[in-house]
Amino acid sequence: AIYGGASSPRVKRVAVSVPGAPKMKIALLSDSHLGLGVSLKRFDKAMNTLEAEKPDVLLVLGDVFEYGPHRRAYAERLAQADIPLGVYGVFGNHEYYVGYENSKQFFKDAGITLLENETAELPGGVQVAGVKDVRTARVSKKDVENLLAKTDKSRPLIYLSHTPLYAEEAASGGADLMFSGHTHNGQIFPFNYLVRLQFPRVYGLFDVDGMKFYITSGMFYWGVPLRFLAPAEIPVIEVNE
């Protein structure tokens, strides 16, 4: 089936088990590419869908806003979201393309705690580590290893990376969960084939040496407003539910 770019993203529920972690519902927002044909009305509808799931925390995986006159309005809609444990995120490649300082301001206005090779701690002790975009900011395997070496191995650890690379390093560094976007699950032909040449994992849930790794197809689209066998989604990760 072809899923047009005007289609609303579907909720994709994914259950994972993480020993020692509290019950938690995590919503993911990735690759919304706001401002490129995605109206504020459509984004508001998607956010209403996301909020209706009542997630404990929202994790933003980059490529959020592109260009357009309504940057502040999009940011304010995100900031209005009722997320008990907060909103944390990382930059994607497009945050660098549209301007680093502009993107930092958008994240700030949207109430997103930006993680740039940093770790934050959620209320309750769960750690969230995030890296700059692996390719655009030239993050190395060693950078990932150094970041995760500083985390508390006695507490659950979530690792965020826009680009779905270095999963093995994340797993060996103690991450229990890893979340990425970027691929759009190919979005349309022929990119669905080309993306598989670039990345060992493109979409869905994987087990990497015991670490659960989910790659999302993204909230909307980039470029052509069409999707082929790669519907847009709002992932809701149910931990130990």
Predicted features, each with a name:
Residues S17-E241:
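Soluble catalytic domains of enzymes that build or remodel membrane lipids, polysaccharides, and related
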Residues A1-K25:
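Acidic, histidine-bearing metal-coordination/catalytic regions of metal-dependent phosphoesterases
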